[in-house]
Swiss-Prot record:
Feature type site, description Tyrosine radical intermediate: Y161
Lineage top rank: taxon: Eukaryota
Gene name per UniProt: psbA
Subunit structure of this chain's protein: PSII is composed of 1 copy each of membrane proteins PsbA, PsbB, PsbC, PsbD, PsbE, PsbF, PsbH, PsbI, PsbJ, PsbK, PsbL, PsbM, PsbT, PsbX, PsbY, PsbZ, Psb30/Ycf12, at least 3 peripheral proteins of the oxygen-evolving complex and a large number of cofactors. It forms dimeric complexes.
InterPro entries found in the cross-reference section: D1/D2, Photo_II_D1/D2_sf, Photo_RC_L/M, Photo_RC_L/M_CS, PSII_D1
Native organism: Barbarea verna (Land cress)
Gene Ontology molecular function: any one: oxygen evolving activity
Binding site for chlorophyll a PD1: H198
NCBIfam families found in the cross-reference section: psbA
Catalyzed reaction equations: 2 a plastoquinone + 4 hnu + 2 H2O = 2 a plastoquinol + O2
UniProt: chlorophyll a ChlzD1 binding residues: H118
GO terms under biological process: photosynthetic electron transport in photosystem II; response to herbicide
Positions annotated to bind [CaMn4O5] cluster: D170, E189, H332, E333, D342, A344
Residue positions binding Fe cation: H215, H272
Entry protein name: Photosystem II protein D1
Amino acid sequence: MTAILERRESESLWGRFCNWITSTENRLYIGWFGVLMIPTLLTATSVFIIAFIAAPPVDIDGIREPVSGSLLYGNNIISGAIIPTSAAIGLHFYPIWEAASVDEWLYNGGPYELIVLHFLLGVACYMGREWELSFRLGMRPWIAVAYSAPVAAATAVFLIYPIGQGSFSDGMPLGISGTFNFMIVFQAEHNILMHPFHMLGVAGVFGGSLFSAMHGSLVTSSLIRETTENESANEGYRFGQEEETYNIVAAHGYFGRLIFQYASFNNSRSLHFFLTAWPVVGIWFTALGISTMAFNLNGFNFNQSVVDSQGRVINTWADIINRANLGMEVMHERNAHNFPLDLAAVEAPSTNG
């Protein structure tokens, strides 16, 4: 008997690298999207931490009145933020090498653009990596589709809104009080609370929280009893056991009697699709609403008050909202302009002399 030994050619370094990147045996899957995700998110995180601690004040309104946002310049965790790039920069791409010096780059809020653009690229790649790992494992792609909702929301406030408004200075600041300031100004300028897409987002988030709590508590309560009536049902289970502990028939029966029969799912896949779709679709709509309001297609307005036969205004809640919006609008960027756009649009009276 003759044995023929064939010498295998050793795999190239590039081939081994490709196999390692796409291997599902790694403790953490990297993937081709991960090759871009890792450096972009590390960059965004590193610059965020450094800037939050030590960045000098930024001339956000482009009027030579810098606003402090970092901890070393007098802020705390609540008031601190990465201040958006200056209105003097607008939508220009503003990397470090475009500035005359690092001091100028910091003064004009360069870190904000750097963080936001790297962050958006990173989370988009994270979404792609979710799809990629699902594909390698033969799974369906809906995990990445669900994650597209927060990605769309982040893209709306950090990129689409500044594009629509003409400047990165209108983007959401990266901090707690900065986020609230963004929300208040957004309401003042766009009446977002009266936009149907925002209403759908509120229903999606609050409804999703309710359904998640209902589902979790129902599953936790619907135990397959392994014990007698004289001892606790909890005694029949070990934490993390492999055996099934949840009886969907019992859960369906309970919930069907608590509300009514057809309010309860008897199919696990239908139930979990609903739990996924409700908040995801709601947040999609909110992101779409932000993206349309970016171009000043705003929420409903009731600028024409209700009047009686004598022409006197009959105050409604709409008038209260209008007055609140005007109050918020005159208070923001108060040194950049003297009047909000609503008031400044009125033709000035002529004067004699």
